Amino acid sequence: MKTSQEQHVCGSTVVQTINAPLPLVWSILRRFDNPKTFKHFVKTCKLRSGDGGEGSVREVTVVSDLPASFSLERLDELDDESHVMVISIIGGDHRLVNYQSKTTVFVAAEEEKTVVVESYVVDVPEGNTEEETTLFADTIVGCNLRSLAKLSEKMMELT
């Protein structure tokens, strides 16, 4: 039997294949201090504490098209060997309460391709359904991963 709290949590996984090698993709993705390079919803990013490694906290201001203006995010895990990054949203003026994402990067079966898998869990805000919350978060994550793919592939063309 689910508790009241469990009924108000949702999550999803978004997968993106990128036509670029893992080291290139990871070098862009792992930059906790500079998400603006591929996240188009980010207007500015400033480290509030830390040096960009595990435990660092960043303040991200977002573009005016979103129903928020800023987010406080903590880097919970950054594993350069396993290519895993875990980020938690710990504050802000948005509805993504208790949001935590885990992004894992793999070498694809096809040569020179990379697979990025981002999964998340988040509280469902009062007045919203799981479907609405998942659709919103999936849209943001999907846009970010497509942008990461586009940037990585463009950088490949330049090499």
UniProtKB/Swiss-Prot annotation:
Receptor for abscisic acid (ABA) required for ABA-mediated responses such as stomatal closure and germination inhibition. Inhibits the activity of group-A protein phosphatases type 2C (PP2Cs) when activated by ABA. Upon interaction with ABA, the 'latch' and 'gate' loops change in conformation leading to a tight dimerization and the creation a surface that enables the receptor to dock into and inhibit the PP2C active site. It comes from the Eukaryota. Its main location: cytoplasm. It comes from Arabidopsis thaliana (Mouse-ear cress). Abscisate binds at residues 39, 68-73, 95-101, 118. A motif (Gate loop) lies at residues 64-68. The record marks 87 as: Involved in ABA binding. This is Abscisic acid receptor PYL12. Gene3D superfamilies: 3.30.530.20. GO terms for molecular function: abscisic acid binding; protein homodimerization activity; protein phosphatase inhibitor activity; signaling receptor activity. Pfam families: Polyketide_cyc2. The keyword Lyase does not apply.
